[in-house]
Amino acid sequence: MACPWNFLWKLKSSRYDLTEEKDINNNVGKASHLYSPEIQDDPKYCSPGKHQNGSSQSLTGTAKKVPESQSKPHKPSPTCSQHMKIKNWGNGMILQDTLHTKAKTNFTCKPKSCLGSVMNPRSMTRGPRDTPIPPDELLPQAIEFVNQYYDSFKEAKIEEYLARVETVTKEIETTGTYQLTGDELIFATKLAWRNAPRCIGRIQWSNLQVFDARSCHTAQEMFEHICRHVRYSTNNGNIRSAITVFPQRTDGKHDFRVWNAQLIRYAGYQMPDGTIQGDPANLEFTQLCIDLGWKPRYGRFDVLPLILQADGRDPELFEIPPDLVLEVPMEHPKYEWFQDLGLKWYALPAVANMLLEVGGLEFPACPFNGWYMGTEIGVRDFCDAQRYNILEEVGRRMGLETHTLASLWKDRAVTEINVAVLHSFQKQNVTIMDHHSAAESFMKHMQNEYRARGGCPADWIWLVPPISGSITPVFHQEMLNYILSPFYYYQVEAWKTHVWQDETRRPKRREIPFRVLAKATLFASLLMRKMMASRVRATILFATETGKSEALAQDLGALFSCAFNPKVLCMDQYQLSSLEEEKLLLVVTSTFGNGDCPGNGETLKKSLFVLKKLTNTFRYAVFGLGSSMYPRFCAFAHDIDIKLSQLGASQLTPVGEGDELSGQEDAFCTWAVQTFQAACAAFDVRGRHHITIPKRYTSSVTWEPYHYRLVQDSQPLDLNKALSRMHATDVFTMRLKSQKNLQSPKSSRTTLLMELSCDDSRSLAYLPGEHLGVFPCNQPALVQGILECVVDNPGPHHTVCLEVLDDSGSYWAKDKRLPPCSLSQALTYFLDITTPPTQLQLQKLARLATEQAERLRLESLSQPSEYNKWKFTNSPTFLEVLEEFPSLRVPAAFLLSQLPILKPRYYSISSSLDHTPAEVHLTVAVVTYRTRDGRGPLHHGVCSTWFSGLKPQDPVPCLVRSVNSFQLPKDPSQPCILIGPGTGIAPFRSFWQQRLHNLKHTGLQGGRMTLLFGCRHPEEDHIYKEEMQEMVQKGVLHEVHTAYSRLPGKPKAYVQDILRQQLAREVLRVLHEEPGHLYVCGNVLMAQDVACTLKQLLAAKLNLNEEQVEDYFFQLKSQKRYHEDIFGAVFPHGVKKDRAERPPGDDKL
C-alpha cells in the first residue's frame, strides 16, 4: 500500500506564518490563519448571524503556545466562519472557539429538538463489533493520530515522524491493524481525558499515570493488573489519577471487558417486600453477580466483586481483597447523630466500563480514576431518590419542616450532608474536592485551553454541579460541546451483548426483548380492558371538606376493583342524569356543620333532593363520616340514604358510620368489606369466595408481640418538629403571658382568658375569626397510672424507637408514626389516652388478658350491641380500662403501636393581631364531668385542664387554622348580627377588637354591629361584660343584648328567645333589606335552635312556605352571608348534666 502523503501536514517551517491580531474581548493575542479544505466547517457549528459570502476570511486563533496541530496553513473554507463566540455572562468575557472544527462525530440533536440532556447519547456510545475496522477506514484515522502525537513536541521530529507514518501504513497493510507505542499510548490516554467534555477536573489531565496491560491474556492477569491499579491510586488516601489499558479490540470477538461500571461499587438487593437494601443503582448488576455464583451478604454497603472478561471468553468473578478498598465512615462536625446513620463511602472513584478510541483503535477495557468531588457522593449517591435517598431522614433529624417544600428543607439538608462528606474525607486524610473549588479549577483550565488549542469541549449540563447552581462560575459560562479524538466513549453493558461459550453459566435472568415486552404489554392491556368491560360498573361518589372522604373513596375503589369496574368521582363532577344508567352506586361523604353537606356536594344535593322519581332501579350503599358529639351525626349520609330509597333504589347494606372521635378507620373497613361481599353476592360475581382483597381489609384482630420491638435511640426530642411531621403542618411555640378566670367567685365553673405571646411576631399571622390549634399534654396522673401497668417499661427517660418486623420476617423497619422518644413522652405528648378504645382495640386487648373471664368480657364488649352501651355509659379512659381489667399484660410496644394519636384542640381566636401584636387570646371553658349518671369517675377535658395548670412563660405548641367562612365582611360598612352564648363569644371579641383598631388608626366607622350574648347569671358568668359596655360607648358595638337562663324568679331565656322577641326587625333589615351578615358561634344545639328561629322569623315576615324558606337560607349560605362556627355539645350517655361544667366537645372540632 502506498503511503498516503495527502494526509500529511505541511512542514513545520510554515507553522508560524501567522498575523497577530488583538481581540479586546479575549484580551489575548490572536492569530489569523487559513484552513485546509480537507477539514471544512460543518454548517451545524456556524455561529448564527454570521454572514457567509464565500470569500476568503481571516480567522482568529490563539498565538500563545499554539499546538502545532492547530497551526497549519490551509485553504480558505468556502462554507462559513471557522470560529464561534462563547460568552461568559458573569464577567462579559468572550472566547473564540476554533477547535470545534476538529470534531469527529455529529451529535444526535435534531433540527427541532435538543438532546443535550440525554444521559448516554448515541454519538457518545460505542457498541460491539462483529468484524475488524476496514483498513481504508483505519489508515486515515491512524495517520491523523500520528500527526497529533508528533505535533505535541516543541521541536519538530520530521525524520521520526515520516518513519512512523510509513511503519503504521505498512503494518495496517500487512495485518489490518497497528499497535501504539508505549509513548503514544500515554499521550492518547491523557489527550482523551483532556477531550472529555463531561469531566470538571481536567486541569490535571497531564498528570495521569498510565499502566500498560496490553500484554495481558487471562482474566486472572486482568485482576492482578486491576489490584495494582487500585493499590497505586488509593495510596493510603492520597488519591492519584491512573488508567490501566488492556488489549485493543481486534475482530470484536476477542474483547477484553470489565463488566463493572466502576471498579468499586456497592451491591443493591431487591428484598421480598419490594424494598431495596444497598445501592439501588446496582440492582441488575448485583443480581448478575449472584447468578454467576457470588454469595450476597445483604448489607447496605457490600463491595461488589469484579466480573472480568478476557479475550472474548466467558467472564470470571473475583472478590476484591478488603485491604484494597479504602472506605470513609461518614460523620458531621456538628451533628453527632449523623454517625448513627451508618453511612460510608469508598475513596476511589474508578470508572471501568468506558472505551478508549484513539487513531481508529478501540480499547474496550481501560479502567481509570481521578478523585471525588464532594457532591458526587453527598448529592447524587446519598440524596438521589433512586439511590440511597437519605435526604428526608436527615431533614427530619435536623428538625426541618419536611412536610412543606417552601421551608427549603431539602436545600438545608443536602448542604449539611455535603458538609459531612467533605469533613469525613478530610478527617481521614482522603483526597476530595469541594464543588466550588472544582468549578474554579475548570474555569482556569478552560481559559488555558482556549489559549493553547483555541477551544475546550464542554458539556454544560454535566459540568454545573448538582447544587449551588448560579453561585458557581461555570453556571454563567457558555460552552460548546463536541467530540474530538482520542475520546472515552460509553459502551453497551457487556452482559447484554456477550456471546456465551458455556451455556450452563449463562445468568438465569434474561432481559425480555423490547419488542416482545411491548407485545406482551399490549396484549395484557387488551385483556384487562376486556375483563374490566365485562365487569359490573360501580360509581363511587365522595363529598369532603378535609380530604378524608376522598381518601376513603379511593381506598374503596381499590377494593371494588378486585371484582368490579369502579370509577371514583367527586359529587360536583357527577351528572345527576347518570343515575338512570347506574347499576351500583357507592357514596362516601362527611357531614359538615349542623348536618350540612360539604361544599363540593351542595350542587348534587340540591338536584337530588328535588328529584321526584327514577325509572332505573340500582343498588347502593352509603358510608358517612362525622363526629358523634353532634346531634345530627352523619346526617348528610343518612339523608342521601333516605332519598335514594325513596327514589326506588335498593339498599345493599345499612348506612355505615365513621366516628371521628373513635375508630373511624376500623368502622370504614368493616363496612367496606361487608358492602363488597354483599355486592359480589347480589351481582353473582364468579369465584367471589376466592377473591384476594387489599391487605388493609384483611388485617388480623390479634396483636402479636414478636412483630414489634423497642430499640434504644440517642436522638433528642424536638417537640415542635415532631408534631409538625406527625400532623403535616407548621407547629410553632407560643408562651403563656397571663391567665385570668373570667367568671366570678360565685360561679362553680371556670372560663379562662388565655393570653399567649410569640417571641417572633413575624412568624405569627392570623385574621379575626380564625382558629388556633393547640397541642396539649395529657394529665400526669393518667400517664403515671398507665406507666405503672406496663409490663416491660423501658424506663421514664430512655429514648426508644419502635421497630416492626417485615411480613416476610426477614428484617426490621422503623415505625414512623411516632418520633424517637421515651414512653413517658409518648403518653404525654403524642398518644390519646382519654378516648375510649375502639372495638378493634378491645379485641386486641382481649388477647392480652390472662384471666379467662376478663378475656370473654372484652370480646363481648367488642361487639356492636355491647360496645355502644359500654362506651357511652362509661366513656372510659385507657387507664380506666386497665383498672377494669387488671389481668391485662400490656407491653410498651402495644401502647406505641395501637393507641391513637392525640389530636390538636381548636379554639376560636379572641383577639385581633392589629390590636394586640404578637399575641393570641383564647377564651377557654375548663371541662369537668362525671360519667354513669354522676356516679362515675371525674373526667377532665384534655386541653382545658392542661391550660388551667400552666404558669407564665410555659410553652404552648400551636398552629393557625384558617376559617375563610367566618371572617368580617370585606365591606366594613355592611351591618352584622353576632350571636354567641358562653364561650361562643370568643371570635366576636376578635371582631370588635379589629373594629376598634380600625376606628382608632384609620377613623373607619364600621356598619352596625349588634351582639347577642347568652349566659346563666349576670353576677356569675357574664364574661367580657365590662368590655362589651366599653365597645358600646365607643361606638364599635351598636347594641348588646343578653339572655340569662338562671335568673331567680324569671323564666329561662336563651339567645333564640331574644332573637324572636327583640331583634326580629333587625334580622329582617340585615338579611333581607341590606346585604348584611349574621354570625353564630357556639354549641350545635344552640346553632340549630337559632337557625330554626330565624327561619320562622323570615317565613312570617316574608310570607314564605317551608320549601321557600329553606331555599332562602340556602342562598344566604351560598352568598356567604350566614356564618356558623359551631362545636359539639352532646354529653356522653349517663353524664349528669347539672354537674358538668362543659361538655367534652367544648374543644373545637
Swiss-Prot record:
In terms of one coarse class, where is the protein primarily found?
Answer: cytoplasm
Taxonomic lineage of the native organism = Eukaryota, Metazoa, Chordata, Craniata, Vertebrata
Q: What does the note under cofactor report?
A: Binds 1 FAD.
The reactions it catalyses are:
2 L-arginine + 3 NADPH + 4 O2 + H(+) = 2 L-citrulline + 2 nitric oxide + 3 NADP(+) + 4 H2O
Q: Where in the cell is it found?
A: Cytoplasm, Cytosol
Write down the superkingdom of origin: Eukaryota
Its required cofactor(s), as named, are: heme b; FAD; FMN; (6R)-L-erythro-5,6,7,8-tetrahydrobiopterin
Q: How is its activity regulated?
A: Regulated by calcium/calmodulin.
Origin organism of this chain? Cavia porcellus
- Quaternary organization: Homodimer. Interacts with NHERF1. Interacts with GAPDH; induced by oxidatively-modified low-densitity lipoprotein (LDL(ox)). Interacts with S100A8 and S100A9 to form the iNOS-S100A8/9 transnitrosylase complex. Interacts with SPSB1, SPSB2 and SPSB4. Interacts with ELOC and CUL5 in the presence of SPSB1 or SPSB2 or SPSB4. Forms a complex with ASL, ASS1 and HSP90AA1; the complex regulates cell-autonomous L-arginine synthesis and citrulline recycling while channeling extracellular L-arginine to nitric oxide synthesis pathway.
One Pfam family this chain carries? Answer: Flavodoxin_1
Expression by tissue, per the entry, reads:
Expressed in the lung and colon. Not detected in the heart, aorta, liver, kidney, and spleen.
Protein's recorded name: Nitric oxide synthase, inducible
